[in-house]
Structures are given as C-alpha cells and as structure tokens.
Amino acid sequence: MYRCPSLLELRELSLCEALLKLDQRNFHCWNHWMLICNMMNVSTEERLAFTMKRIEENPSNYSAWHFRCELINKTITETNAESVLKEGGSTLLHSCVELDLNLNGLYTECDDQSAWYYLRSLVYLIVKFVKSGVLAKEKGVALISNELEALAELEEAAPDCIYLTDFKTEIEHLLHAIEWTVS
C-alpha cells in the first residue's frame, strides 16, 4: 500500500542529505537517513543511486560503501532465488556491476581501505548466497575467480599496495571455502 510521505519525513530526508554533504562519513546521519528512507518506502534503486552519488563525490567514503553493501544484501535476500539463478538475471548482473565498480575504486586509490572493505563484503555475500543455495556454486566460483585475476593485474600495476596481499589471501581462502561446498 502506498502512502504519501509527510512533510516532516521529506524535511528529515532533505536535512540528512544536506548533513551528509557536509560530513559524508557521519554514520549516525547515515543510519537516520536509512530509517527515514524505510519510513518513506524509498526504493532500493533510489537509495543505491544516492550512495553512488556520495561515492562519486568521495571514493574514500567508507559509510557510503558500507550502506551500499547493506542495500545489495537486502536486495538479493528479498529477491526470489530462481531469478537470482537465472542466466543473466538482473540481480546476478548487478553483482557483476558492483564488482566492476569496486575494481574501479581499487585502481583509483589502491591504498584507501574503503574499497577494499567493500570488496570483502561483496565476496562474503557471494559466499553466503552460494552456501544458502541462492547462487549456483559455479557462478560464485566464477565471480570470485574473476576478482582474483583482476587483483593479480592490480598487483602488477601497484606492487606496493598495502592492502592487496592481505585481502587477496583472504579472498583465496573464501574461494576455497565455496569450492568445497557440496552442491
């Protein structure tokens, strides 16, 4: 059922957005923004667009990356499992787009922790959905393997990157964890 947002809710949302322009990492404001979005039934697409705008303004905005991952987790969790498994399904395609977006962030500033932690979150989501049967094991292995190949290329371009070795090792362990998952 649709309900028209109140003027107070619209004002709160506008205030949150103004405050986040001033202090992009203010997680208290981000939490309040999410609460208001939930109350107003703001679509996931609109929320993802908002987080993308904040990331474009500041790729080091850890809060924007974090809330983007929360939204993706929510989207996939609420999506019908069959549509996720469907070849070329929009949710699976969205996961690939997110991984590409993240890779761009890593190439832009490989010593910034925000994109690395977002990558970790995305890989953990892939593992979670493979283990729960929402995502086919082969698809999960392919997604993670592609990321490891991209990280190997990044390693050649930026051998002194401080986070690369640790995250690459962790992602390799996660890949092995789902390779051993019984289908």
State the predicted function of each range.
Residues 74-183:
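Structured C-terminal portions of repeat-based eukaryotic scaffold domains
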Residues 1-109:
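Eukaryote-skewed repeat-based solenoidal scaffolds used as protein-protein interaction platforms
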